[in-house]
Structure formats: C-alpha cells, structure tokens
Amino acid sequence: MSSTLQAILDDTRRDLAARKSAARTKEFEKRAAEHTPRGFRTALWERAQAGVAVIAELKKASPSKGLIRANFDVIALAKELEEAGAAALSVLTDVPHFQGSLENLERASQTVRIPCLRKDFILDPAQIVEARAYGADAILLIVAALTDLDLRNLRDEAKRYGLDVLCEVHDRDELKRAADLGFDLIGVNNRNLKTFRVDIENSLRFAEEFPPNALRVAESGIHSREDIDRLRDAAYSAFLIGESLMRADSPSATLRELIG
C-alpha cells in the first residue's frame, strides 16, 4: 500500500472514531429507510446498450492535483451533467483530501434522477448507512484498502440497504481478488497509487481476465472519444470521468463530445 493511501486511510479512521455514535447511526437508519435506491449497475448496463455510459464525477480537488475546479456549484453541475447525458454521478465525500462532503452527495442526489455513487474510502459499516441516508445509490470499495473479509462484510452491509457496490482494482492481483469474491461491478483505476501516474493502458493490460458476469468500468485518464472507443473494444461498458469534466469551461459540452 502506498504511503499516500495509508495516510488517507489513517485520516478516515480518525474521522470515523470522532463522529461515530449509536445515536448518529440510529438517525441514519431512519433516514435511509425513507429512500428507495436507484439501480446504479442497472443504469450503467442499460445506457451501455444504447450508447456510452459515463459516470460523471463531481470532484473539486485531489491530493495529487490540488484544486481542480474553483467554481464548484454541486447543484448546477449535477443538473448540467445529467442533461448532457451522464448515466450516473460520482460524488466525492472525503473532506480533507478532496474537499468533498456528504452534503454535496445529498444535494446532487436530490437534484438528479440518475443514480449517485458515494466516492470515498469506505472502511466501516457505519459509512454505508450514512451513504444511504445522504442519498447514495452505490458505494465504492477499494480492494487495495481492504482485506477479503472486509470486502465481503461491507458488500453484505451495502446489500442490506439496497446499495450497489463498485469494486475498484488497480492491478491483476486485485482483479483476481475481486473476481474470486464474486463482485459483478468492477472498476479498473488507471492511476498508479505509488506514483500517481495515470495510464489507460492499465485497463487494457488485463481486460481479458475479468469474470464473464462482471460489468467493466474504466476509471481515470479518459480524455477523448478515442480513449472511450479503445476501452469499449476491450469490452468496457462504463467510464468514470472526473478531471476532464471538472477542468472544462463547459462540462456539459465536454461530456457531449465524449459521448458522441
């Protein structure tokens, strides 16, 4: 595990310890029961049958790039990207490293009809009910950050709340772990966790090793329709795109160009 990822996970655990409580979880349970999740995996699969399924990511900043978008109006961006054809949204909720928030997730979820992914470092079941309470329809589980037992337990907890799980891998060994655990929505992150270098060839190197039932998602480093076409030729069904959209003067115009 890279030192950067370890530092982020340590911060996440400290934050969880500071705000986790039985009363807070009970309140989230109540709020979670008020909403019916929108099918995240189904939305991606259906859009992929008709065109290009893009998960548009609302990301203000990152540890490697610093501030990405200064004019970060979550409601306006969510509306704009849905209207431009996004199949789903990914909303960063990590505060210290990505300048995200659960409130941003809630605002986006209440604004759009497409499903929303909570993009964060999920380590504890308490974060899952919290995600549902704030309107998430899916969560991200990062194989590099979790043991196989953690992955199973957190996936089961997500299912309890009707949430889909995007299982994120970075290399061949992590893909095998995800496949052996039976995940059916697997994303390959093209960002090297040690160097932070991004290379979409990472998604192509082991494309043939996916389990047959898994819907494939390519994440990071996608900047053009040519990138998408190459990945589609390798049987990728969906594409998580953040920085290209967030740096654009017109995210909607950029998304339309990518979708074609």
From Swiss-Prot:
Keywords linked to the UniProt accession: Amino-acid biosynthesis, Aromatic amino acid biosynthesis, Decarboxylase, Lyase, Tryptophan biosynthesis
Keyword Amino-acid biosynthesis: yes
Highest taxon in the source lineage: Bacteria
Catalytic activity: 1-(2-carboxyphenylamino)-1-deoxy-D-ribulose 5-phosphate + H(+) = (1S,2R)-1-C-(indol-3-yl)glycerol 3-phosphate + CO2 + H2O
Cited InterPro entries: Aldolase_TIM (IPR013785), Indole-3-glycerol_P_synth (IPR045186), Indole-3-glycerol_P_synth_dom (IPR013798), Indole-3-GlycerolPSynthase_CS (IPR001468), RibuloseP-bd_barrel (IPR011060)
GO molecular function, one term: indole-3-glycerol-phosphate synthase activity
GO biological process: L-tryptophan biosynthetic process
Pfam families named in the record: IGPS (PF00218)
Pathway listed: Amino-acid biosynthesis; L-tryptophan biosynthesis; L-tryptophan from chorismate: step 4/5
Gene3D superfamilies linked to this entry: Aldolase class I (3.20.20.70)
Family (UniProt): Belongs to the TrpC family.
Name of the protein this chain belongs to: Indole-3-glycerol phosphate synthase
